[in-house]
């Protein structure tokens, strides 16, 4: 074939398979491929155009298309090929190539029909063909295509083999599918057939089985009855045997002894036969009767008493011949009697009668032979007659002897036999009649007995099958439970290994991240590292420069969810951890650069900024103190500044966890000063702190860095809106001249105004007291994480407070990418480190070491005793107090009302409501320990007052001073007529209604009055009535005035008169006669001359005063006046008032009640005007300061009223803590100390204020209710005013950030659950600036819940020491605490020592039995209902605590 013919007729020359076949499914191997590669079967790649077709295409592109009509021969050949192609095939062509489909054939572009060529194009093609034909060698015929042809054949074979293989796989798949479907169909049919068969035959089978079971049960009972009968037979026969042997031993006659021995032998044979039947050996005969003979119901016979044996007549051969009765021996007769008795006893017991067994034919034959022999022997021989006289005499003598001896004897025997026979017949008749009646009586009874037996049988059968089914069910459940437990154990082991690999991956990832950060910093400084990051399984050594190279940024990053933690080989996990760590470092650096470049798309948050490098390995670059910082940094503070600067330059977040009081604030301020001075970065900086420290931050920034401007962002919503105008603006450039550089605000305000803070790109965000974000689920944590900031710095003195979960929250906040949503890491922090629930202690120690390696790089912590030598020591003392009687009664009553066992069982269930109830109980016990008045205050008591008090609608309109004098009046009023109360009822009072008042006044009051001056004068001149006036030093006018004065006015006048006579009598000490002669006009003034009050006034000391005031001095000396009155009246009432319709009595009563002179005389209260006049006129105040006429009350406590006010002394002694605190404060006050007094409850602070007021101690107070603007002034007052002795604070509000170095004593009235909260509170005084030793007193009530809480707090402190300080874990018993036992531990706090010991003993016994003590059936369901894990700290501070 020539090349021209190929070009002229490509369609005709192309073979049908080539035209119909699709392009090959596999890519042809290159020319240099090996035979192994050629023969390898691979999945078919996308189709491609063969090289030959490609050449044809190229030629078609070069040559114009020409249409050449095929010749007739070619046309015929094409038709044959078309017919062959149109025949149906089985999918395989002749050359072994799969037949192409229609769609595949139509997809080839070069098989499409060609267009018609022009004549010029046809001529050109023909010329070219002629040239090709005339050439020396054709391209087709010339060699050079052998290799392509071989390759083509190889591809065809490979396609054929592949097609065959695919068809085989498809056939196998179809066969498997068909078999599966067929199996399912057959299974359905079989199941349906089984159901039909069960439905059809289930009832019959059940009935048949039940019938068989009933029959089996009957047979079993019959066997049991037969067995009991045989055992009874053995017992009776054994008794008979023993009795026979005993009789044989006692018998004297040999025949009788032989008889008894035969009976014993017979009984032995029967015993042997019965035992053989019991043992299962088939006896030749059934033992069914007592004797081998049948029972004789007719009685005994006398045939045995014949002298001679008469042979019975032989039976005739005929069936109906007469039968003679055989003779019976004594043994047979006795046997018949015994049989009769046995039959009678059987009938009495309703037992079946024993029937005599049939004798063997052999025995019958033997009996017959014996009878025949006896008959033969008994026939006597004929005797010859012999008669003699002696014979006859002997014969007669014999008959006489017979008649005398034998006949009576025989008669007696015969009569006895007859009577015996009659008696037996009578008994037999009675038995027969009784038995006949029994059949009639037993008809219904037997039916009832049958029913009862059937019911009892059914019950027994049901109980048996139920018991059997229960046992089988228990065994099946036990097997299933064991199988499930083994499967759970295996699954738990697999899951534990998987979790361990997850944890190793996470820890290795963080360790490698820390290692890469350290290498990069050291590489930048030109210092080769020599430290190693040690893990539990591998050790990463820096080594050579090409190891762990950071330039390998193209390493594949694997998601945590895509990792295979089930594989045993951990090489892939280590490689993935290394790649992820490298990628995290690169992302952190890129984001830091992007933030500095101001790219908007990277301004969201640098969540990948992490740092795990130890501050000592961050390099040896020494950074000097900024010049704009006015304070002088200490050495350790300068080191902290270097660490913070390196963190910022690398874009890494960190935790500054120095102990409280070492200057975390000044170090943070120095970082901002460094950035402003060196890098010209003036902000904006964001400082978030607790509300109590906001003023402190503002003051210290202004004080130490005056060039940095602070914007205090707090106040009301309106104030904050005005402040936002300074910073809530776009495109603000922060320079030295900016309006502000640092914004200081609180956590609460950040959450409220989070939408405004998120708009600003903060250069540095500093969180003071970062334990405020210890919960990663809180809105505060999420809002702060969403802020756009370049770096974050957390300041905290206590990174671990209650548990390790809080430390993990801080780590999650500063590096959320590596730790985000990793529950395994969280569980490791909160479970394995804190509780060590696993038994593998070595694994826990390795994890603890790796935790230290993770914490060291990015957390800097220094302790005071290591860095600050000039700071005074801190001494902690636990002061134990005892419960008072009232506290002990309250505590015992509370504990008796609570069941400790019930609480522990509820704690094992773990319901949230039960946990809250338990915490409320703990709060009640703590209240009792603090002060019983927290439950019930001692109220003010007073008698029931039957009176009416003044009322007012509002005190506002009453003014500043409300006058309520004499506002109390009796509810009883005595009404009087107007005539009596008015002037009309008075005789001497003139008025419109009294026309005779002048007459009566003139005559009655003057003329007829004996005290008239004229009458007194006339009577005193001689020895009249008033002649004594000259001896009593009284004039006429004085007597007249006293007659017109009342008794009260006379007493007041007598009180104002000086006691001159008695004083003179005391001073001169003269005789009475001499004094009387010296002063005759006072002769009759005996009382004034001998008044003892003058002696008391003159002699103020010495024995004379004691002798004159014996009663008063004894009363005062014994303290009777200060004793509280033991009895108070039940009711009290003011005097009954008089009422009238007239106003006259009201005016008169007011004149009497509000008389100034009377009130002054009674109470001796001089007015301000009188005191001013005495001072101005320089008068002697003694006459104007006379003692009150109203005597002093006997009781100083009660005074003039019966109102009982609670005693403050009792208030102090009712609480053991307060009594101990009273002694302690007295000593501290005398020593010149100043005290910080911390409380957990604000109500206790209220009570403490009353106590301090009672003791006159000056104090100030700060708790959660103190306003923000007042806190700064309160702290400043305590710091600047030394007279303030006590500062009352709540541990939560007053324990954060404030500086109280003026105090050198800290007292915790009640301790916090969290020991770090107390540590923060005591460091308010023990911090920089404190030059004295700080003493910390902690009041603990002995033997109560507070002592157990303190022990738990010490364990928490040990956890912090182990994790943060890197100490050994030997001091903490981690194995005794897990997540489920926290609530149970709280319940154990409520128990006393005896109850706790009993509960621990029961727990030990439960563990020995393999049970869980206190667990109930609903425990798992209740545990699943818990929505969240409530910590002790959260539940404790929900109940009336000081709010932070």
Swiss-Prot record:
GO BP annotations, alphabetical order: CENP-A containing chromatin assembly; DNA repair; positive regulation of transcription by RNA polymerase II; regulation of TOR signaling; subtelomeric heterochromatin formation; telomere maintenance via recombination; transcription by RNA polymerase II
Leader sequence range is: none
Q: Which UniProt keywords apply?
A: Activator, ATP-binding, Coiled coil, DNA damage, DNA repair, DNA-binding, Hydrolase, Nucleotide-binding, Nucleus, Transcription, Transcription regulation
Q: Where is the composition biased (Polar residues)?
A: 29-41, 101-110
Q: Where in the cell is it found?
A: Nucleus
Ranges of Basic and acidic residues composition bias in the record: 55-85, 329-340, 357-377, 438-452
Against Pfam families, the record matches this protein to:
DBINO, Helicase_C, SNF2-rel_dom
Domains: entry comment: The DBINO region is involved in binding to DNA.
User: What name does the UniProt record give this protein?
Assistant: Chromatin-remodeling ATPase INO80
- Source organism of the structure: Aspergillus oryzae (strain ATCC 42149 / RIB 40)
Gene (name only): ino80
């Amino acid at each position: 074939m020539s090349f021209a013919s190929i070009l002229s007729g490509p369609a005709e020359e192309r073979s049908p398979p080539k035209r119909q076949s699709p392009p090959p499914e596999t890519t042809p191997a290159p020319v240099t491929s090996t035979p192994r590669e050629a023969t390898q079967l691979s999945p078919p790649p996308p189709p491609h155009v063969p090289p030959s077709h490609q050449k044809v295409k190229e030629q078609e592109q070069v040559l114009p298309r020409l249409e050449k009509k095929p010749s007739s021969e070619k046309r015929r050949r094409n038709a044959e090929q078309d017919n062959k192609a149109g025949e149906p095939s089985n999918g395989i062509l002749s050359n072994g190539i799969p037949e192409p489909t229609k769609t595949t054939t139509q997809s080839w572009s070069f098989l499409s029909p060609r267009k018609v060529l022009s004549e010029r194009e046809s001529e050109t093609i023909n010329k070219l063909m002629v040239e090709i034909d005339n050439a020396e060698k054709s391209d087709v015929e010339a060699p050079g295509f052998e290799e392509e042809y071989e390759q083509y054949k190889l591809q065809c074979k490979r396609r054929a083999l592949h097609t065959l293989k695919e068809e085989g796989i498809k056939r196998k798949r179809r066969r498997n599918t068909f078999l599966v479907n067929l199996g399912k169909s057959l299974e359905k049919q079989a199941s349906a057939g089984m159901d039909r068969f069960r439905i059809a035959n289930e009832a019959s089978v059940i009935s048949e089985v039940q019938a068989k079971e009933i029959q089996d049960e009957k047979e079993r009972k019959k066997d049991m009855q037969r067995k009991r009968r045989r055992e009874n037979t053995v017992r009776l026969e054994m008794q008979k045997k023993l009795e026979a042997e005993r009789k044989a031993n006692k018998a004297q006659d040999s025949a009788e002894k032989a008889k008894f021995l035969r009976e014993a032998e017979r009984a032995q044979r029967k015993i042997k036969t019965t035992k053989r039947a019991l043992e299962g050996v088939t006896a030749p005969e059934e033992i069914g009767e007592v004797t081998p003979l049948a029972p004789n119901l007719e009685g005994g016979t006398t045939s045995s008493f014949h002298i001679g044996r008469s042979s019975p007549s032989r039976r005739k051969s005929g069936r109906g011949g007469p039968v003679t009765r055989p003779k019976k021996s004594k043994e047979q007769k006795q046997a018949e009697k015994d049989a009769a008795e046995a039959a009678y006893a059987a009938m009495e017991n309703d037992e079946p009668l024993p029937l005599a067994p049939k004798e063997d034919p052999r025995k019958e034959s033997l009996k017959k032979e014996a009878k025949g022999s006896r008959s033969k022997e008994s026939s006597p021989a004929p005797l010859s007659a012999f008669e003699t006289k002696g014979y006859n005499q002997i014969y007669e003598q014999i008959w006489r002897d017979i008649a005398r001896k034998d006949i009576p004897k025989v008669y007696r025997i015969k009569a006895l036999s007859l009577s015996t026979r009659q008696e037996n017949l009578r008994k037999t008749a009675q038995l027969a009649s009784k038995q006949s009646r029994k059949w009639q009586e037993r008809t219904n009874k037997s039916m009832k007995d049958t029913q009862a037996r059937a019911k009892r049988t059914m019950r027994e059968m049901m109980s048996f099958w139920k018991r059997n089914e229960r046992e089988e069910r228990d065994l099946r459940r036990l097997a299933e439970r064991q199988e499930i437990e083994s499967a759970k154990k295996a699954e738990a082991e697999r899951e534990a290994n998987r979790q361990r690999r997850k944890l190793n991956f996470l820890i290795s990832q963080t360790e490698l991240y820390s290692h890469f950060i350290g290498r990069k910093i050291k590489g930048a400084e030109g210092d080769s590292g020599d430290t190693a990051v040690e893990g539990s399984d591998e050790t990463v050594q820096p080594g050579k420069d090409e190891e762990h190279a950071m330039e390998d940024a193209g390493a594949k990053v694997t998601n945590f969810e895509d990792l295979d933690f089930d594989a045993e080989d951990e090489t892939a996990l280590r490689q993935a951890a290394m790649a992820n760590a490298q990628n995290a470092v690169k992302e952190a650096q890129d984001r830091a650069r992007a933030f500095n470049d101001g790219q908007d798309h990277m301004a969201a948050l640098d969540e990948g900024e992490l740092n795990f490098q130890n501050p000592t390995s961050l390099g040896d670059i020494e950074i000097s103190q900024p010049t704009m910082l006015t304070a002088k940094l200490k050495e350790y503070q300068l080191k902290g500044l270097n660490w913070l600067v390196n963190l910022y330059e690398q874009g890494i977040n960190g935790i500054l966890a120095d102990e409280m009081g070492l200057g975390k604030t000044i170090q943070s301020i120095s970082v901002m000063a460094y950035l402003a001075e060196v890098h010209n970065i003036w902000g904006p900086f964001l400082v978030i702190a607790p509300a109590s420290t906001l003023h402190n931050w503002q003051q210290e920034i202004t004080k130490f860095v005056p060039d940095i401007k602070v914007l205090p962002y707090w106040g009301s919503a309106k104030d904050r809106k005005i402040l936002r105008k300074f910073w809530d603006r776009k495109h603000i450039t922060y320079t030295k001249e900016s309006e502000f550089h640092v914004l200081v605000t609180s956590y609460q305000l950040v959450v409220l105004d989070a939408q405004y803070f998120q708009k600003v790109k903060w250069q540095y965000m500093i969180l003071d007291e970062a334990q405020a974000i210890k919960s990663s689920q809180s809105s505060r944590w999420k809002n702060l994480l969403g802020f756009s900031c370049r770096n974050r710095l957390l300041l905290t003195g206590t990174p671990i407070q209650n548990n390790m979960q809080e430390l993990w929250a801080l780590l999650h906040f500063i590096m959320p990418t590596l730790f985000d949503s990793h529950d395994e890491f969280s569980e490791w922090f909160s479970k394995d480190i804190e509780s060590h629930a696993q038994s593998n202690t070595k694994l826990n120690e390795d994890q603890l070491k790796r935790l230290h390696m993770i914490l060291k790089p990015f957390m800097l912590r220094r302790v005071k005793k290591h860095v600050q030598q000039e700071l005074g020591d801190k001494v902690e003392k636990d002061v134990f107090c005892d419960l008072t009687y009232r506290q002990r009664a309250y505590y015992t009553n509370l504990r008796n009302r609570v069941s400790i066992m019930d609480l522990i069982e509820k704690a094992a269930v773990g319901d949230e409501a039960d946990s809250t109830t338990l915490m409320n109980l703990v709060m009640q016990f703590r209240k009792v320990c603090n002060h019983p008045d927290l439950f019930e205050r001692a109220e003010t008591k007073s008698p029931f007052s039957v009176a009416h008090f003044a009322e007012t609608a509002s005190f506002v309109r009453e003014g500043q001073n409300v006058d309520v004098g004499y506002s109390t009046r009796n509810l009883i009023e005595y009404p009087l007529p107007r005539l009596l109360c008015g002037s009309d009822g008075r005789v001497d009072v003139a008025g419109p209604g009294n026309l005779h008042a002048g007459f009566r006044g003139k005559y009655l009051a003057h003329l007829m009055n004996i005290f008239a001056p004229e009458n007194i004068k006339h009577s005193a001149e001689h020895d009249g009535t008033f002649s004594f006036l000259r001896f009593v030093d009284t004039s006429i006018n004085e007597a007249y005035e006293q007659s017109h004065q009342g008794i009260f006015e006379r007493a007041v006048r007598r009180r104002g008169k000086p006691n001159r006579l008695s004083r003179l009598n005391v001073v001169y000490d003269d005789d009475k006669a001499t004094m009387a002669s010296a002063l005759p006009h006072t002769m009759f003034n005996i009382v004034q001359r001998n008044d003892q009050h003058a002696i008391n006034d003159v002699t103020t000391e010495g024995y004379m005063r004691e002798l004159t005031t014996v009663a008063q001095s004894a009363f005062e000396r014994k303290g009777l006046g200060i004793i509280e009155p033991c009895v108070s009246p039940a009711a009290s009432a003011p005097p009954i008032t008089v009422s009238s319709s007239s106003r006259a009595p009201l005016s008169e009563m007011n004149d009497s009640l509000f008389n100034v002179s009377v009130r002054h005389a009674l109470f001796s209260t001089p007015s301000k005007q009188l005191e001013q006049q005495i001072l101005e006129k320089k008068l002697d105040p003694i006459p104007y300061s006379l003692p009150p006429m109203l005597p002093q009350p006997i009781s100083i406590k009660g005074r003039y009223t019966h109102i009982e006010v609670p005693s403050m002394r009792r208030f102090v002694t009712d609480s053991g803590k307060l009594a101990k605190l009273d002694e302690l404060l007295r000593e501290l006050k005398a020593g010149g100390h100043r005290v910080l007094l911390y409380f957990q409850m604000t109500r206790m602070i209220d009570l403490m204020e009353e106590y301090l007021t009672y003791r006159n101690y000056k104090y100030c107070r700060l708790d959660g209710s103190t306003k923000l603007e007042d806190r700064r002034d309160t702290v400043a007052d305590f710091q600047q005013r030394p007279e303030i002795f006590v500062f009352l604070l709540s541990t939560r509000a007053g324990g954060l950030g404030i500086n109280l170095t003026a105090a050198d004593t800290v007292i915790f009235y009640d301790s916090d659950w969290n020991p770090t909260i107390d540590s923060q509170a005591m460091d308010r005084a023990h911090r920089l600036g404190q030059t004295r030793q700080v003493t910390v007193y902690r009041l603990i009530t002995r033997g109560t819940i507070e002592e157990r809480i303190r022990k738990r707090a010490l364990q928490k402190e040990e956890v912090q020491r182990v994790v943060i300080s890197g100490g050994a874990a030997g001091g903490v018993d981690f194995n005794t605490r897990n997540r489920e036992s926290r609530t149970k531990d709280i319940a154990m706090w409520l128990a006393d020592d005896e109850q706790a010991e009993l509960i621990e003993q029961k727990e030990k016994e439960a563990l020995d039995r393999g049970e869980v003590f206190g667990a109930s059936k609903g425990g798992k369901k209740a545990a699943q209902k818990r929505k969240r894990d409530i910590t002790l700290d959260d539940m404790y501070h929900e109940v009336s605590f000081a709010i932070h």
